[in-house]
């Protein structure tokens, strides 16, 4: 006999995974609903072209279902899911690179499938426009980082994961995450100093 998914209140991700492991396939739907946007945002922040994000996110949830038995009940769910999604995203990026399909145009906001940010000219006040320009500059600086450094910034600074959780996702040690984050911050500091010196 299986236990019901929802006993009282809203089940945690970990409880839903335990239910999914116990044969309750209905536990997958709330996980997808909760995490679909977060997975897509994570993939975009890793540099996956927006044209590929939907497919990879769907594949991540298919893998979640297929690999549900490998999830250790009681372990943090977020790093486990982002590891699945990140691996799929990195595989797609490697595939694109090998096929020479990845180009500067994919990063160009004027091209379909590129990154799209808020138009700073659409802001009503000059201070909002300045903030939008600053945010765009920082975003561009982060995107210009080497992939392993950018991934450390995304995991620790944007996703607010611990070094250990980030290490699990990135497939390295917590010390390596710390080192990559240090190097990324150094590069970002230099880039931002150059930006502000121009103004």
List where the protein language model places each region.
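Internal acidic/polar
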Residues: 2-5, 9-10, 99-131, 162
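Short, charged helix-capping/linker segments at alpha-helix termini
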Residues: 3-4, 21-30, 40-59, 174, ...
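Sigma70-family region 2
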Residues: 21-22, 48-49, 61-76, 95-97
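Amphipathic, Lys/Arg- and hydrophobic-enriched alpha-helical face
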Residues: 32-50, 67, 142, 187, ...
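Residues in the helix-turn-helix
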Residues: 52, 176, 183, 187
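Arg/Lys-rich amphipathic alpha helix in sigma70-family domain 2
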Residues: 66-73, 83-104, 131
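Short, Lys/Arg-enriched C-terminal cap helix and immediately downstream tail that follows
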Residues: 94-97, 150, 185-199
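Helix-turn-helix DNA-binding module
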Residues: 139-176
């Amino acid at each position: 006999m299986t236990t019901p998914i929802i006993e009282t209140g809203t089940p945690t991700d970990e409880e839903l995974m335990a239910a999914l492991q116990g044969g309750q396939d209905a536990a997958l739907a709330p996980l997808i609903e909760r995490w679909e946007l977060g997975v897509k945002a994570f993939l975009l922040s890793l540099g996956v072209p927006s044209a590929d994000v939907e497919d990879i996110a769907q594949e991540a949830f298919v893998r979640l279902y297929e690999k549900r038995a490998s999830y250790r009940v009681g372990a943090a769910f977020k790093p486990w899911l982002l590891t699945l999604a990140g691996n799929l995203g990195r595989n797609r990026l490697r595939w694109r690179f090998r096929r020479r399909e990845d180009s500067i145009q994919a990063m160009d906001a004027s091209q379909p499938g590129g990154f799209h940010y808020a138009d700073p000219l659409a802001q009503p006040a000059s201070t909002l426009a300045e903030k939008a320009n600053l945010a765009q500059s920082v975003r561009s600086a982060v995107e210009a980082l080497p992939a392993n450094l950018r991934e450390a910034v995304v995991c620790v600074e944007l996703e607010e994961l611990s070094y250990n959780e980030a290490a699990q996702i990135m497939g390295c040690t917590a010390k390596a995450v710390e080192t990559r984050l240090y190097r990324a911050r150094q590069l970002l500091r230099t880039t931002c100093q150059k930006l502000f010196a121009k103004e």
